[in-house]
Amino acid sequence: MISTKDLSGLPNAERLKNFCKGLAALDIIMVEEEWSFIRHYTYNPAWRKGKEAFFATDGSDQSMIVLFAPEGCVINGVDSELYDWEEKLPRIEDLTDGMPPALQKLMSSREVKKMKSTFCVWTEDGTTWHCNPMDSEDASKDLLSTIDGNPLSYVEYGKWFYPADLPLEAVRQLADGVPVTKELVTALNPKRNEWEEIKAGLDKIGYPHEL
């Protein structure tokens, strides 16, 4: 399983971006707008000029932000329950040691500072991932496993969260960034037919569709 001890299962940054958008699109399709506050995944294609951001939460103690920029990609995660006192959190200087300056600027964003950090992972070339693993538990195994690029992870997530048995082929299309159609929505959530609401949600996260 992916963790800061073994990053070999993380997809490349381009695949990761599609996968993250797909997770956010899945939440839009499965959870109506009036219940959007319970969604676990959101995506902002215009987080900063030329930069995009994916936000994830388990609804409790674990949170993660993935930042995509021309200079590379940074993944920051935290489990607030791992430490009794804030001063026991890992030093950000230790977590980012060796990180290129351009990516360190992303780590200084107000969203990351507010979230705090128990781990961070980065890539400059979009393929090779780096981190400075801590000796203590850091929640990376739980959080990174949700963005492994595998459509089956979507299916397992759906069984637990919605709950629903999501069709693998429909889920695979979301993971691959295939435009959402009415047929795809119906395959995932037969009860969902608020087309304008879905369209607006997908437009907001920059996910392609044919609605």
What are these regions (language model features)?
Residues M1-D61, P70, W85-L211:
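N-terminal domain-onset segments
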Residues C73-I75:
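Alpha-helical solenoid scaffolds in large eukaryotic transport, assembly, and signaling factors
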Residues V78-W85:
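Short, solvent-exposed aromatic-acidic interface loops
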